[in-house]
Amino acid sequence: MNSLENLILVGVIKSCHGIKGHIILKSFTIPTTKILERNLVNESQENINIKLISQNAKGELICTFNDISTRNEAENLKGYKLFCLRASLPELEEDEFYIADLNHLTILDQDHKKVGKIKNILNFGAGDIIEIEFLDQTTELLPFNKQFFPVITKNYGILNYKREV
């Protein structure tokens, strides 16, 4: 396993906030404040120190970041990714997955023939949506539930869906 496979993306710095070097953090944890309980690292596995200042109406966290104290320094952090070590995360239940483990997962049809792969996982507030890239390079969005994906393993997912061609 390479070093990035040992990391789980848990947040990204969206922008700066104010003149004191605060950042707006988009957390991928549920609840969003759960990210503050993790030991955060960057891609080089260097420790990151984040402290919560407040939370805005969108659920984004306004935080201090390491020793950043000016708006100019904070502006340079836009897009900065925050990770935690996979080994530090809790064990999952049988039907639970980390998004990082689903990305690029092979998708099979009911006859176990490869039909594509997961291209992206989206969530607009009503549940996870899976973007599938089919072998013909077309994509479709489907809800991530047992009706469409009755079987998911670490190696593949079974798709219960007939495409309109």
From Swiss-Prot:
Family: Belongs to the RimM family.
GO cellular component entries: cytoplasm; ribosome
Subunit comment: Binds ribosomal protein uS19.
Boundaries of every PRC barrel domain copy: 94-165
Gene: rimM
Comment text on domains: The PRC barrel domain binds ribosomal protein uS19.
GO function term, MF aspect, one: ribosome binding
Main location: cytoplasm
Annotated source species: Rickettsia canadensis (strain McKiel)
Protein name, per record: Ribosome maturation factor RimM
Disulfide bonds: none
UniProt keyword list: Chaperone, Cytoplasm, Ribosome biogenesis, rRNA processing
Role of this protein: An accessory protein needed during the final step in the assembly of 30S ribosomal subunit, possibly for assembly of the head region. Essential for efficient processing of 16S rRNA. May be needed both before and after RbfA during the maturation of 16S rRNA. It has affinity for free ribosomal 30S subunits but not for 70S ribosomes.
Location(s) in or outside the cell: Cytoplasm
Biological-process GO terms, alphabetical: ribosomal small subunit biogenesis; rRNA processing
